């Protein structure tokens, strides 16, 4: 299983003081050095952490895979096509939320989704949708032209250990199996941490996990390099 490191909260920490440090690009390079298979950043409409300049610098610096999370807006479509990350991930976005609260509502947006994705398909930029682990959403993602799905693991992360968490893990497993049967690549993310990630090693259909907050929080105490290496030790 591969690890993609989300460096948004490096920028959050920097922006808390309006300074230049810590530098998210430096964090991205260190993550790659430690063995991360990709770097994830979310260019939100309000630019609350990563900004346009960060994105441009990340594109120049990242040599593994740059995954740009973004809302489905015309402005961000143009920015993404100009920047040319290896992958874009469409996510829902609410200005009042602290972090992404759920999967992309593909049923609601399906009528316009395929047309929105076509320029990315034509440009050779892979497309992922951050969705709930549900078969209908996966089917629609495939039909709309997605190459990957990122399964939302937030509900799993919120469950206490026991039957409820096991049930949610099984739902994710079944969704991953279904997605792979359609030829989609599968990623998982949201709320995953050092204590709850281990069971995902048993779901072979999930090729990669995307983790940010847990790693950055651990890095405050142990350093970023050790925080990343510790996560890699758990998932390998």
Swiss-Prot record:
CDD domains to which the protein is assigned, alphabetical: PNPsynthase
Site (Transition state stabilizer): 150
Group of enzyme by EC: transferase
GO cellular component entries: cytosol
GO biological processes: pyridoxine biosynthetic process
InterPro entries, per the entry: Aldolase_TIM, PyrdxlP_synth_PdxJ, Pyridoxine-5'_phos_synth
Positions of the catalytic residues: 42 (proton acceptor), 69 (proton acceptor), 190 (proton donor)
Residues involved in 1-deoxy-D-xylulose 5-phosphate binding: 8-9, 44, 49, 99
Top-level taxon: Bacteria
Residues binding 3-amino-2-oxopropyl phosphate, per UniProt: 6, 17, 191, 212-213
Keywords assigned by UniProt, alphabetized: Cytoplasm, Pyridoxine biosynthesis, Transferase
Pfam families: PdxJ
Keyword Transferase: yes
Pathway(s) of this molecule: Cofactor biosynthesis; pyridoxine 5'-phosphate biosynthesis; pyridoxine 5'-phosphate from D-erythrose 4-phosphate: step 5/5
Catalytic activity: 3-amino-2-oxopropyl phosphate + 1-deoxy-D-xylulose 5-phosphate = pyridoxine 5'-phosphate + phosphate + 2 H2O + H(+)
Gene Ontology molecular function: pyridoxine 5'-phosphate synthase activity
E.C. number: 2.6.99.2
Cellular compartment(s): Cytoplasm
Paired cysteines (S-S): none
The protein's role, per its UniProt record: Catalyzes the complicated ring closure reaction between the two acyclic compounds 1-deoxy-D-xylulose-5-phosphate (DXP) and 3-amino-2-oxopropyl phosphate (1-amino-acetone-3-phosphate or AAP) to form pyridoxine 5'-phosphate (PNP) and inorganic phosphate.
Family designation: Belongs to the PNP synthase family.
PANTHER family recorded: PYRIDOXINE 5'-PHOSPHATE SYNTHASE (PTHR30456:SF0)
Assembly notes: Homooctamer; tetramer of dimers.
UniProt protein name: Pyridoxine 5'-phosphate synthase
Organism of origin: Pelodictyon phaeoclathratiforme (strain DSM 5477 / BU-1)
Gene assigned in the entry: pdxJ
